[in-house]
């Protein structure tokens, strides 16, 4: 006797716990459950996936993996990687740490001068954004070893406005304060009047 359709079955993959509940990119996440040896991929919020080849360890009851820098807060998904995959969602959202943007100084600054940004977990910052959409990537600012301070040169064409941090996960972290850029003022030109091909001198504040 033969059946008309193939008989298939699947193991009851389950998630019992995900720890720690709050985690920073680069740290090891532990997932406990059953039949986890069948999992080929762990998917974080917004489709950020870690394949089993990158797992730190895996058994039937537990998976350990490092959280990728692109990961964002949200539920995680376990997938068996089949053509029609079995996907199991965590009950609770995983809280992925973002940079904390405490303050910046000075709040009034001349373009070309150095701005100091303070906070926590600033090693997760990929870019600093100034008013006018001026972006400074991480290879153009300095970060202290504690990850609590960034020093960045204000672009010459930066506008007044907010200073934002762009995390490596793509999330924008705001501070709420406004940066004011100092422009040249009190300008004077000598000699006045002037003839063609004559050298002039411009004086003023914040030149």
What residue ranges belong to the model's regions?
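Ser/Thr/Pro-rich low-complexity tracts
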Residues: 1-207
């Amino acid at each position: 006797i033969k059946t008309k359709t193939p008989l298939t079955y699947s193991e009851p993959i389950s998630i019992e716990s995900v720890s720690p509940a709050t985690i920073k990119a680069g740290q090891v996440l532990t997932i406990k459950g059953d039949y986890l040896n069948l999992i080929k991929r762990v998917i974080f919020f917004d489709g950020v996936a870690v394949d089993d080849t990158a797992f730190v360890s895996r058994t039937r009851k537990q998976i350990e993996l490092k959280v990728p820098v692109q990961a964002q807060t949200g539920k995680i998904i376990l997938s068996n990687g089949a053509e029609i995959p079995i996907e199991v969602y965590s009950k609770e959202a995983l809280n992925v740490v973002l940079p904390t943007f405490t303050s910046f100084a000075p709040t009034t600054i001349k373009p070309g001068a150095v701005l100091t940004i303070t906070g926590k977990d600033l090693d997760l910052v990929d870019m600093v954004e100034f008013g006018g959409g001026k972006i400074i990537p991480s290879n153009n600012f300095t970060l202290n070893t504690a990850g609590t301070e960034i020093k960045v040169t204000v672009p010459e064409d930066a506008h007044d406005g907010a200073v934002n941090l762009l995390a490596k996960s793509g999330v924008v972290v705001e501070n709420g304060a406004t940066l004011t850029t100092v422009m040249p003022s009190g300008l004077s030109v000598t000699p006045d009047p002037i003839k063609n091909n004559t050298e002039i001198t411009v004086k003023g504040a914040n030149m």
